[in-house]
Amino acid sequence: MASKQLKLVIITGMSGAGKTVAMQSLEDLGYFCVDNLPPSLLPKFWELMKESDKMDKIALVMDLRGREFFDSIEPALDELDNTNFITTKILFLEADDKVLVSRYKETRRHHPLEPNGSVLDGINAERELLSDLKGRSQLVINTSNMAPRELRERINNEFQTEDKDIFNVQLMSFGFKYGIPIDADLVFDVRFLPNPHYIDKMRPLTGLDEDVYEYVMKWPETQTFLDKLVDLLMFTLPFYKREGKTQLVIAIGCTGGQHRSVALTEFVGKTIQQKYETTISHRDMKRRKGR
C-alpha cells in the first residue's frame, strides 16, 4: 500500500461561475480531474487513489448536478477531514447575480434548479443552498469581472505555489457608491476622513497622485486609524493563515473609490507587503470618465 499524502481540491460553487475553466486549469497543473463525482462515492474514490503510485494530486468538480449533492456533501467532507492521508482544499467559485443571469442568457441554458422557471430564482435558491459550503471553503473566488484567461491565471498563481506555503493578502480599494466587494473578508470604511474631492485641484486626481496622497495622510485621524488598522491586521493575519486560508481579501472603501481609499490601500498594502505576499488593486478608480 502506498504511504503518501494525497492532495484533493474540490471545485464547487455557483453554476455558471467558471468551474469548468478551473478544472481545466488544474488539469494543466498536473491534477487528475474528475467531473461531477457523487459525494457519497468520495471516500471510496479516495481509498482507490491511495493505492495508486501515479496520482497524488486530484481535483474533483462537485455541484448540484449530482441529485444527492446537498444531502451527502457535508458528511463526505467531514469524513475526509478525519482522514490523515488526505489534504483537502475547497475552491468555491461565485459571481454576482446579474453576471450569472447574463452568462445564462448568452449560452441560452436553463438553471439546473429551475429548468422551467426563472434563472434568477434558480440562482437565489442555489446561493442559499451553498452558503454553508462556501463558509467552509479555503479559497473563494468571485469571477464577476474575470475573463476565462484571468481565472486561469488566478488558479495558476494559487496552486503553482501551493507547496511553498503561500498566504496571499489582497488589498483592494473601492467606492461604496458602487457596492461592497462581494468577495471581501474584511471591509473598512474610511469615509470619516477629510475628502479631497471637495478641493477643486484634487478632484480629477486619485490617491495615487502625490498631492492627494499627502493631503489624505496629513491628518492626525488618518495616522491614528492606520496605526490601529495595521496593528489589527498584523495581529490577526497569522491566525487566518493558521486556519488554512490561502488568501485574505481586505477592502478599504470611501465614497467613490478615487481618493481616500486608494491612498490608504497603498499605504496598508506596502506595509503588509513587508511580511506577507500582497497584491494591491483599485476596483473603482477607472470608473471616472476620461481615465
From Swiss-Prot:
SUPFAM superfamilies: P-loop containing nucleoside triphosphate hydrolases. Gene3D superfamilies: P-loop containing nucleotide triphosphate hydrolases (3.40.50.300). One of its GO terms (molecular function) is GTP binding. The keyword ATP-binding applies. Pfam families: PapZ_C, RapZ-like_N. Keywords: ATP-binding, GTP-binding, Nucleotide-binding. InterPro entries: P-loop_NTPase, RapZ-like, RapZ-like_N, RapZ_C. GTP binds at D63, L64, R65, G66. ATP binds at G13, M14, S15, G16, A17, G18, K19, T20. Displays ATPase and GTPase activities. Belongs to the RapZ-like family. This is Nucleotide-binding protein lmo2474. It comes from Listeria monocytogenes serovar 1/2a (strain ATCC BAA-679 / EGD-e).
